[in-house]
UniProtKB/Swiss-Prot annotation:
Gene Ontology MF annotations: glycerol-1-phosphate dehydrogenase (NAD+) activity; glycerol-1-phosphate dehydrogenase (NADP+) activity; metal ion binding
Organism: Bacillus velezensis (strain DSM 23117 / BGSC 10A6 / LMG 26770 / FZB42) (Bacillus amyloliquefaciens subsp. plantarum)
Cofactor note: Binds 1 nickel ion per subunit.
EC code: 1.1.1.261
Protein name stated in the entry: Glycerol-1-phosphate dehydrogenase [NAD(P)+]
Gene from which this protein is expressed: egsA
A GO CC term attached to the entry: cytoplasm
Amino acid sequence: MKRSPEDIQSEFDKEGASRSPIQIEDIVIGANAKEELLRFLQKKCWNHPVIVCDRNTYEAAGRLLADELRAGGIKASKVIIPEHEAGAAAADERTLVYTLINLAEETDVIIAAGAGTIHDITRFAAYQRGLPFISFPTAPSVDGFTSAGAPLILNGIKTTIQTKAPIALFADTNVLKEAPRSMTAAGFGDMLGKITSLADWEISRRLAGEPYSEAGAKLVKDALWQCIDHRAAIAMGTEAGIQILMEALIVSGLVMLALDHSRPASGGEHHISHWIEMEMLKAKQPPILHGAKVGCACAVLSDTYKELACHEKLAELPPHFREAIQSAYEGLPDGKTIAGWLASAGGPACFDEIGVKQDLVSDALKHAHTLRDRYTGLTIINENAALFAHHLHQ
C-alpha cells in the first residue's frame, strides 16, 4: 500500500494538526493477503479466531480463509450471520445478540470476512467482548473497514457507536477481483461521495467553526481523484484498478480514524443515504448497497448545492455566508458529470435505477440533516426554508 498509517500520521504532524494515533499494526493489500493474515496470527500466538461472515461471503472467502488457517495450525471457527426477512444481514439488535452468543468462550480474535455490514457487526461484538478484530474485506465496497465507529440500526434508527478499529487489515486482491461488480461500483460511489462531503466540510469550518484539517482534505481529495482517473480499470475489475480503489477507501478511512470524526468523507450525501436506508428498513424493503445510495445522492446534492450557490435569494444572507457557500459549492461538478462517472464504473447513475422513488428523495432532502449534529449545505437550505427549500427540494 502506497499510503501507510505512518504516512497518514506524518501528513497531519507536518501540518501540526491535532490527531488521534492510528493503532492499526498491519495493512496488506495484495494477492498474498491470506498468507500474511496467517503469519500475523502466528506472530500474535492467536490460535482460536472466529470468522464472522454471511452466507455469501463465507462461500466467496470465508471457507478458503478458514481452510488456510487450519492448514497452518490455527483452530479457526465461524459465525455465519443469518439473513433478515428483507434478504440480507443487518447490523441491528437481533444480529448483534446472535453474534455475541455464538462466539466461543476460547475466542482470542475475531475476523470480519465480508463488506461493510459484517465489519460493523464484528467491530461491535469485538468491542463488547474486549477482543481484537481483523479486517478481511471481500469487496472494495465502503471506506469504513478501518473505522472505529460502528453504524448500527438501533430501535430502527441509524446510530453510530464508537467501538474500536481493527488491529490489522488484509485485503486479498484475488478475493476482491471476484466481488460482484455492483459492490465494486458501490465502493466507487462511496468515494465519489467525497465530492460533496469535502465541500460540506469546508462549509462546516467556515460557518460553524467545526474542526478542519487541510492535510486531511488533501489526502481524501487525492484518493478521490485517483479513483476518478482510473474508473475504467476499476470498472473492468483489473488488479491495478481494484488496488487503486481499495487503497483510496482505506486512505479515506484512515483519515477519519486519525481525525476522530468522519467529516472529510461523510456529508449531506451520507445523511441522505442514511435517511433512505432507515425508511426502507421501516417498510421492510430489501436493502440497497450503501455506496450505490451515496453515489446517487452525491449527484443530486451536487446540483442542489450548485443551485444554492447561484440562488437569487442568497443575497439575503449575511455576506460571509454568501462567500462561503459560493466558494464551497460553485465549482462542484454537475450532477450529469457525476452520474456519468458512476455509470462508467458500472454502477447506478440515479435513484430511479435503484428503485428509490422521488418523493423519498425529496423527504430526505428536507429531513436528513437532522440525523447528525453536523453543519452542511442541507442544514443551510432547511434552516432558511422560506428562502430556498421549496425550489431546491424539487
